């Protein structure tokens, strides 16, 4: 019976480690992801939502919803820009914002149609 008790304890310790690891990884992933912005939402040339507020260090995911091509241009923060055109619906770009401030962005091909937005970083 001691052998079985030892084996059960071994499996329980492994299960505890796995569950704890899973919980921690989910918590860390949730902390890093702050907002999702759709591009071309509802068949319109818009960012949806076109304004979000996040904390410094968080990431915004841009998703090409439809009506390609789209890109993401930050006029005052060129290093954050994603100038390459996104053609495939479902294609994503993740952008991390390390510093507090207001980050205005646009889609260069559709700026004239009003495809603009702002990310407020606290």
Region annotations inferred by a language model:
Residues 3-4, 29:
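Serine/threonine-rich, low-complexity intrinsically disordered segments
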Residues 4-19:
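Bacterial N-terminal signal peptides that target proteins for export
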Residues 1-2, 66:
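A subset of signal/propeptide-processing and intrinsically disordered low-complexity segments
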